[in-house]
Amino acid sequence: MMNLKPLTFLPFFSRLVFLSGVIYNTAWANTVIPVDNSRPDETFSRTSPKQHLFSQKPKPAEPTSSASSQQISLTIEQLASRPDLVLRALIPALKNNDMRGVEILLPIYAKQSPDPFLLKWAQAVVARKQGKLNESVRLYRQIIAEKPNLQPARLQLAIALTQNRENEAAKAQLNQLRSENLPAPLLTLIDSYIDAINQRDSWNVYGGVNYLHENNVNNAPPKGTKVEGFTPSSQPEKAHGLSYFINFSKNWSLAHGFFTEFSADINGKYYWDNHKYDEFSTRLNLGGGYRNAKTEVKLMPFVEQFWYVGGENATKDARTLHRYSKSSGINLDVDYWLTPNWKMSTVLEYTEQRYIQPQRQNSNGNSYSVSNTLIYMPNSQQFWFVGLDYYQKNTQLKAYAFERQGIRLGWGQEWSKGISTRLQTSYATRTYQAPSAEKNTIFAPSFFKVVQKNREYGVNFTIWHRSVHWLGITPKITWAYQKTTSNNPFSEYDRNRIYLTFSKNF
């Protein structure tokens, strides 16, 4: 694996061009334009970008003096009178990332009834060459939204994102490219580039805001529930507001792939029409690990504080946040690419939790969680995943302690016309350690005297448009449905939520 500590882009592109199937030794000196005069496909949409970009054997150039030469040289003035030749020169220049050639051809092509898609691609290339990275990224995202299988443009987007210091977004594009059927040398090069991104030690900031529309913010059973003459103490409550989150993180690279990391997470909810459910939390993480292009192992001790107005236990007009609980623990996170198409992600966490209010201290205890997810990416436009989860909460009062086992299934897709979707379904069982009431308790329903067992169902569907950006922010609409059935009727509920998410990497 090559040493890419000083992240440079010229060597990277020189290797890409070497591997490219359509290579043109263009000098572009003295405004003389070499033109590939071989017969192209009739329409650009019928070309196969992946085939051209990732073919391993470059086509040998024929002598320009030969009568059968496939390349001719024209001045800009001569080329301007031949729109067909402009197009034949522009397409390979775009696919081969020939920024100088595209910069020369763009003004000519723009005056010749240009194809809007090719014009936008050329503008993206020129914007990147001129250092207008925000504009270039915006145009490339629109291009990928329209043609998600256009791998040369996706690769150019990844480079533009890296140059613009949008490291996580760049890695996401490179990982999508790895799922394609690429030659081994190019896969190695992409891995090396991911390694180089990993060695950047700049601060990363990620945050977002969700609009919340809650019909059952307190997870109460349906209105009118009555069993054995008993009615639940709570009724479903509505709430509208915002949730927000922000993450700050910084890595310090050490030798041989090791690193230390600090991160801070801030999360909260604010309901303008039901403040008693407002909440706020902070979590600080400090640890380290090891990573390369295929593997990342990270061990992060953490401390966390949680503030809450009080929920159902608070007065109707309450709105002051109070310290509710504090936690500390350790998190182990392992990501490993089994192949270019298969990835395994495992997270283990141990937590000690203590409640501040005396009446809640019988819930003090610890918890263990394990989450294992297998991801399959057949290509850069699609992924599937299956996950298994285990969570165990131990408390002083056994009626509050439980064990939860779950499974998740998901599918993500980049569609044509710029639409992207993500679907996740989940199922879990939750079994408590002890009944809520003793068997000889008189004033308690019978279902309080047996161990509670729940079945939990969930569906999440998110949709967004990849080319819709404002200041680097992509809005996403999510519908979330949760349903719980139980042998305790007072713990049964269903919950529909629709929220609009605005998030951004800074």
Tell where the protein language model's regions lie, with residue ranges.
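Gram-negative and organellar
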Residues: 30-75, 83, 90-96, 103-107, ...
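Gram-negative bacterial Sec-dependent N-terminal signal peptides
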Residues: 1-31
